[in-house]
Design a protein with these regions (language model features):
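Short beta-strand segments that buttress and anchor functional surface loops
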Residues: 76-79, 200-208, 217
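Short extracytoplasmic
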Residues: 56-80
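A short, polar/charged loop/turn motif at coil->beta-strand junctions and beta-hairpin connectors
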Residues: 52-54, 68, 73, 89, ...
Length: 333
């Protein structure tokens, strides 16, 4: 008679099973602790990076991580410019949140790239009298700041409810002009889906003083030299809303008028060519001493930076000019 129950478990097997259970439980606890601590680790890393950008200071208030999406969300972020002379901080960029994630459709094609989605973002350029080269530096440095948020190349970038603002507090009167309700979508920036000369696209729309702005560009974002083909238009902007700008830079007032602007520009091999065409409708300037033609000349120069031939259509009360643009980019730095 067999006294050994074949269904019973030997002490050694029970001990091994308990050991494996302890290991599994320990790993689970470790993962839970890591999951809880990870947002704080990443948040401290990002804030450390943002506080050590030369000429800038930034901070993120909070951060959420979504492991199943391969994503994290930074909340209430701001980046200020630090004036090297006065050490005063000037607002440069802010956003309610930025969602940074792996772009899964590119991963399926064997490319590991990221996408960024910004909500309620503000990009502000300030004409700082103490640092006249600040505007150019701001434009060049902004794309470098994106690397703070992700070690991966950014292939897709989208902005919802954005605002792009230009301030000149030293002007008389102070100038504050902006594009509002801005939506920007840049795709294939890393040339994942297309390898043609201009594989990436940038599409943007915005409100501008009761008018609309549309912007379309094809670009090679990875090219060493600027390589792009763009067109943009502003339709039905109310010139009266821009009076502070014209008073400060043109020394005249506008009582009535609507503005359209058409722009085409292409760049390749360190050269660029295109044109800008402003069109003004129903213009009425303030002050009987002001001549319309001299005001128009100032207006063109204020808009495009150079003088152009002015054509007037009395039947439609519309005045327009077309200014060619051509030149070469400066030396690489």
């Amino acid at each position: 008679m067999n006294l050994i129950n074949p269904s019973s478990t030997s002490p050694s097997k029970q001990s091994k099973r308990k050991h494996l259970l302890r290991i599994g439980l320990g790993v689970l606890i470790l993962l839970i602790i890591l999951r809880i601590a990870l947002p704080y680790i990443v948040l401290n890393f990002i804030n450390n990076q943002l506080s050590n950008i030369n000429g800038y200071y930034g901070h993120v208030d909070d951060l959420d991580i979504s492991l199943y999406r391969g994503a994290y969300i930074v909340k209430d972020i701001y980046i200020d410019i630090v004036d090297t002379t006065t050490q005063k901080q000037l607002p440069f960029f802010s956003a309610d949140n930025i969602d940074i994630s792996i772009e899964w459709k590119s991963l399926l094609k064997g490319q590991i790239v990221s996408e960024l989605v910004c909500h309620t973002a503000l990009l502000r350029f300030t004409n700082n009298a103490s640092e006249p080269e600040q505007l150019e530096r701001d434009s060049n440095d902004f794309r470098l700041m994106l690397r703070t948020f992700t070690p991966l190349k950014v292939n897709r970038f989208e902005v919802f409810n954005g605002k792009i603002q230009y301030l000149d507090p030293a002007a008389s009167p102070p100038v504050d002009i902006f594009l509002d309700n801005t939506h920007i979508l840049a795709s294939n920036l890393s040339n994942v889906e297309d390898t043609t000369l201009l594989p990436a696209t940038v599409i943007a729309t915005a409100d501008i003083y009761e008018g609309k702005m549309n912007f379309n560009m094809r670009i090679n974002a990875l090219a060493i030299d600027p390589t792009y083909d763009l067109n943009a238009e502003i339709k039905n902007a109310n010139l009266v809303k821009l009076n502070a700008f014209f008073k400060a830079y043109g020394d005249f007032d506008i009582n009535k008028g609507m503005l359209d602007v058409y722009l085409e520009l292409a760049a390749k091999d360190r050269k660029y060519i295109g044109y800008v065409k402003p069109v003004i409708k129903d213009l009425d300037v303030v002050g009987p001493e002001d001549r319309k033609d001299s005001v128009l000349r100032k207006l063109w120069e204020g808009i495009v930076g150079v003088a152009g031939d002015i054509a007037e259509n009395p039947k439609t009360d519309q005045i327009a000019t077309k200014v060619p643009i051509a030149g070469e980019f400066g030396d690489r730095t």
